[in-house]
Amino acid sequence: MQLFGVKVSAFYRFCSIIPARLSNFAANYIILYMIDTTIFQNKKAVYYTLGCKLNFAETSTVGKMLKEAGVRTVRPGEKADICIVNTCSVTEVADKKCRQAIHRLVKNHPGAFVVVMGCYAQLKPEQVADIEGVDLVLGAEQKGDLMKYLGNLEKHAHGEAVTTAVKDIRTFVPSCSRGDRTRYFLKVQDGCDYFCSYCTIPFARGRSRNGKIADLVEQARQVAEEGGKEIVLTGVNIGDFGKTTGETFFSLVQALDKVEGIERYRISSIEPNLLTDEIIAFVAQSKRFMPHFHIPLQSGCDEVLKLMRRRYDTQLFASKVHTIKSYMPDAFIGVDVIVGTRGETPEYFEKAYEFIQGLDVTQLHVFSYSERPGTQALKIDYVVSPEDKHVRSQRLLVLSEEKTHAFYARHIGQEATVLVEHAKAGMPMHGFTPNYIRVELEQDEALDNQMVRVRLGDFNADGTALQGTLM
């Protein structure tokens, strides 16, 4: 029997790809783009993801779709029929890594149908399509419609690019990934309306948009049913949640907190001006949301923050750190910092360094500024040399190590609950405390994905974790 020219069995199989109660977008493309999935039977795919956790979540969704259509992931040594590359374009180095990854996959999997998606694909689709071996380039609006564009998997003489103007990118594609770790990454928001002077992400991912709270809660319940215990909320600008649904990030946090079976939530990264005292107070009293924050600072100098077109100053940032610590003295606070941006004079850097040095934060994620075409930052005259960028970066990395070491050392001798993660071959068993201290444990596969009480001992050999003893 056929329905709209498609085998009914294939139609039902394709319907099963989409979890219940997801977005209208998902429901619509089932109806509009029903396909005969028998062309995917016995096919093998390889997936390569670059960049942020959001990308990994989206790749996982693509993988689930292909798996339900009959495609399995390649095993070591096998050749793939389909190569999926999810790209990043946050820096010039990221662009280069994307090209290298594509070349490597084309070489290692001759004859495979190569699909490239992600930020680099949206920003430079024709450049990506020109890479030898690439068959299909999908923009931000199209990647959720992968099944529609795969066709019959025949190689193209030249790559086909299908993208949408950034102003027309409006679809929210639900995504959730597990990967090799115990924790899951749940995409709650996409896109950004901030247009900072140095950043191309709004041009790569479009305007801010989000899923519905009811749908996201349902995804969290599904994670719990699969045995998942920890979820990290991910997005481009998650504090801006609610633009498309009239809801708020605080309401989302409250709703997720009620999902039974999930032991831990972490907020991946949230802008300081969107991290409200209300959210901080809620996390402090919640048994499920962990005392762990990641807040992008980018610069500790107000003059540079203005050049960056950031929406806060150092006084506001310091007040957020103070509020967190007043509620949760042992909270882990990670901070993003960019060094060497245009306009960052030696005096401005020293001012920033002094401010960061005085902050009660745990870890710095240090990035060297990379010039991106089309950004407003290129209009700023003062340029920092690569040598100075390196020196400044190293100083902040040393400062970060000092802060992290002091934070860990303060907890030696204490008891804590650790969620044990799956150990990679040849690596020690490890897990994390509620406030994100990495703890190494004696090898015991029975502990995988288990919550255990440990006593925190001294540092491990390389100083990257504390040694834990089971209570």
Where are these regions (language model features)?
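Hydrophobic, well-ordered secondary-structure elements that form the walls
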Residues: 295, 336, 356, 364, ...
